[in-house]
Amino acid sequence: MREKFEFLLSVRLLECEIKELTIYSRAYCNCYELLNIKLDELCEIMVREETIRQWMVWRRDEEVQRQVDRLRETAAEALCDVEKHQSKSISLIEMDGNKYLTTLIQSVKDDLKSFDINQQSKVLFIGSGAFPISVLTIAKEFGAKVMGLDIDSEAVQIACQVAKAFDIETLVSFSDEKLSSLAFLKETTHIIIASLVKNKIEVLNQLKELIDENVHIMLRYGNGVKSIFNYPFNYDLSEDWNQK
């Protein structure tokens, strides 16, 4: 049992640190750098062999799972704040020379290679956030028309400003509308659902009633130990969707 409580304590400490740094950052923006470092640390911890081993042992423990859920919610809230700060402060020159962003953009490009997006595509990105790197990359690299959708109206406003700053607003738009009233769905050819979208099954159930059967959907999620910083997805879709 000692191992369990050591693991539980490490998760609680991470949650506490991220929560406090989020509060500090809202009061003093220079703390966002510390918060970003802590979120990077969380990403590194997720892939460590020791973390994976501990997760395999304690993943079904209710107390551990509750604490992991709290950490994920805290980290997701912190990431939203970090993205808003980055979007407000970063310039085009900084983006071109930023190693982290360059790596992230390349990761997006690699992830979408098999998704058959081209200049004729109309892409809906659900959960685009305030720092919509995926949306901007799709438009810039593939020449596709992209709409980013997010429930956070402030994030939508900031994302619009980013698109304008990067001179790509002719291909990119953002909205906080409900799926049921989104006119863009009528012309959508591809849909991407972000990993930090919590209610994925509800979104899929809505889409099933709203889209053409030929629309391609990419569902991003993190199961297992990756659920520490990603919302998991554990539903069988074989009866309702054609899967690749």
What residue ranges belong to the model's regions?
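Conserved Class I S-adenosyl-L-methionine-dependent methyltransferase catalytic core
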Residues: 40-118
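Conserved class I S-adenosyl-L-methionine
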Residues: 119-130
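Conserved SAM-binding loop of SAM-dependent methyltransferases across substrates and taxa
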Residues: 130-144
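Conserved SAM/SAH-binding beta-strand->alpha-helix loop
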Residues: 151-154
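Conserved SAM-binding loop
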Residues: 159-160
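Conserved SAM-binding strand-loop segment of SAM-dependent methyltransferases
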Residues: 167-179
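A short SAM/SAH-binding and catalytic strip from SAM-dependent methyltransferases
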Residues: 187-202
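C-terminal substrate-binding/active-site "lid" region of AdoMet-derived donor-dependent transferases
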Residues: 204-244
